[in-house]
C-alpha cells in the first residue's frame, strides 16, 4: 500500500472513530466494520423471527473501560442505536448470512449480513474476542458467582432476510438543542440563604461602602476613583464562556446522535463534523422570545447570587450609580 493510501486509510479510521465516540465515548479502537447489518429478534411464544427496525453500519470496537469489547449498529431508521457489550458468557452461532448471539435463551437475537463471507468474518472476530475474555483471569473472577453458561439450543433460522435498500434513506436533519440561558443560571446557583451575608463575604466594593463610618458619605469622585482601581478587564459573554467550556464539550461528546450507515460508499455516510453542536441561530440573548420570564422571587435570588459572587457585576451596577449620582449633583 502506498503512503497516500495509508494516509487516507488512517484519516478515514480516525474519522470513523470520532463519529463512533459520539455514540460510545469510551470507544478507543475500531476492530472491524461492515457497511450494512440488520437485527432480528425471536418471538419465543410463536417460535419465529421478527425483523427489528434497526439496520445500518456495523462496528466491532474496543473500549477503554469494561466491557472491553462491544459491537453496535448505527441505526439509520431511528435515533436508537443498537449496542451489545461482549461478555465471556456470550454464545455465538454462525449459519449462512446470520450470526446468532445470546447470553441466555430469553435474549436470543440474530445479525444479518448481505454476504455470507462478511457474516463468517465477523463471527470469527466475535468468537475470538469472547475466547479472549474467557482466558482472562480477571474476567473469570468477576463472573465466578454469575450464572453458568447458557445451554446449547437449536435456534430457528429466520424465514426471510431484509431487502437491501438501493439507496440509503434520507433522514431529516435534527434541530440543534436550544439553550435556555436563564434556566442555566438558575440551575447553577445555590439555593438562597435566609441569613444575611457577612461583610467578609461581600464583594470588595460593598465591603468598603459598609465599613464607612456613619455620616461620612463618600464623594462621587472618590467612588469613581475606587471603581477605576478595582475594575477588571471585561470578560467574554457568559454564553460564549459556556460554549467554550469543557462542560459543554463533554456534554456534546456523550450525544446519542445516530450515524447513518450505507451499503457501498461508507465514507460518504459518516459525515465529518465537530463534537460540539452549534447553537440555534434563532436564539438571541436578551430577546425574551426563547426564555421564560422570572417571577419576583427568582429574580431576587438571581440578583442576590450575582451580587455575592460576581465582583464585575457589582462594579457595573456601581458605575451606573456613580454616573447617575454625578448627573444629579451637576443638575442640583
UniProtKB/Swiss-Prot annotation:
First and last residue of the signal peptide: none
Pfam families for this protein: DCP1, mRNA_decap_C
One GO CC term on file: P granule
Listed CDD domains: Dcp1 (cd09804)
Keyword line: Cytoplasm, mRNA processing, Nonsense-mediated mRNA decay, RNA-binding
Record's compositionally biased regions (Low complexity): 141-173
GO MF entry, a single one: enzyme activator activity
Summary of the knockout phenotype: Double RNAi-mediated knockdown with dcap-2 reduces survival at 20 degrees Celsius.
Tissues expressing the protein: Expressed in neurons including touch receptor neurons and motor neurons.
InterPro entries in alphabetical order: Dcp1, mRNA_decap_C, PH-like_dom_sf
Chain residue ranges for the region called Disordered: 141-175
Keyword RNA-binding: yes
Top-level taxonomic group: Eukaryota
Subcellular location: Cytoplasm; Cytoplasmic granule
GO term, biological process aspect, one: response to oxidative stress
Family designation: Belongs to the DCP1 family.
Function of the molecule: Component of the decapping complex necessary for the degradation of mRNAs, both in normal mRNA turnover and in nonsense-mediated mRNA decay. In contrast to orthologs, does not possess decapping activity and does not remove the 7-methyl guanine cap structure from mRNA molecules. In the nervous system, negatively regulates the expression of insulin-like peptide ins-7, which in turn promotes longevity. This may in part be through promoting the activity of daf-16 in distal tissues. Required for the developmental axon guidance and regrowth of PLM touch receptor neurons.
Quaternary structure, from the entry: May be a component of the decapping complex composed of dcap-1 and dcap-2.
Protein name: mRNA-decapping enzyme 1
Amino acid at each position: 500500500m502506498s503512503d497516500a493510501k495509508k494516509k487516507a486509510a488512517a484519516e478515514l479510521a480516525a474519522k470513523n472513530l470520532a463519529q463512533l465516540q459520539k455514540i460510545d465515548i469510551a470507544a478507543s479502537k475500531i476492530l472491524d466494520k461492515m457497511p450494512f447489518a440488520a437485527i432480528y429478534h425471536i418471538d419465543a411464544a410463536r417460535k419465529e423471527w421478527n425483523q427489528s427496525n434497526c439496520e445500518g453500519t456495523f462496528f466491532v470496537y474496543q473500549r477503554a473501560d469494561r466491557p472491553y469489547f462491544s459491537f453496535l449498529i448505527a441505526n439509520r431508521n431511528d435515533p436508537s442505536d443498537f449496542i451489545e457489550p461482549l461478555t465471556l458468557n456470550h454464545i455465538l452461532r454462525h449459519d449462512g448470512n446470520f450470526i446468532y448471539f445470546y447470553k441466555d435463551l430469553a435474549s436470543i437475537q440474530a445479525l444479518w449480513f448481505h454476504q455470507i463471507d462478511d457474516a463468517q468474518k465477523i463471527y470469527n472476530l466475535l468468537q475470538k474476542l469472547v475466547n479472549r475474555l474467557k482466558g482472562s483471569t480477571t474476567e473469570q473472577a468477576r463472573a465466578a458467582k454469575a450464572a453458568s453458561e447458557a445451554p446449547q439450543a437449536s435456534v430457528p433460522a429466520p424465514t426471510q432476510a431484509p431487502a437491501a435498500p438501493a439507496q440509503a434513506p434520507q433522514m431529516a436533519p435534527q434541530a440543534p438543542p436550544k439553550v435556555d440561558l436563564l434556566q442555566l443560571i438558575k440551575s447553577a446557583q445555590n439555593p438562597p440563604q435566609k441569613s444575611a451575608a457577612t461583610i467578609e463575604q461581600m464583594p470588595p466594593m460593598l465591603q468598603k461602602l459598609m465599613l464607612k463610618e456613619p455620616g461620612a458619605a463618600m464623594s462621587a469622585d472618590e467612588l469613581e476613583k475606587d471603581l477605576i482601581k478595582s475594575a477588571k478587564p471585561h470578560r467574554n459573554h457568559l454564553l460564549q464562556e459556556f460554549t467554550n467550556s469543557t462542560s459543554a464539550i463533554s456534554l456534546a461528546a456523550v450525544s446519542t446522535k445516530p450515524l447513518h450507515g450505507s451499503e457501498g460508499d461508507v465514507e460518504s455516510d459518516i459525515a465529518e463534523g465537530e463534537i460540539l453542536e452549534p447553537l440555534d441561530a434563532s436564539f438571541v440573548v436578551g430577546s425574551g422570545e426563547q426564555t421564560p420570564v422570572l417571577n419576583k422571587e427568582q429574580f431576587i435570588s438571581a440578583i442576590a447570587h450575582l451580587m455575592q459572587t460576581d465582583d464585575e457585576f457589582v462594579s457595573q451596577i456601581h458605575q451606573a450609580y456613580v454616573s447617575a449620582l454625578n448627573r444629579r449633583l451637576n443638575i442640583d
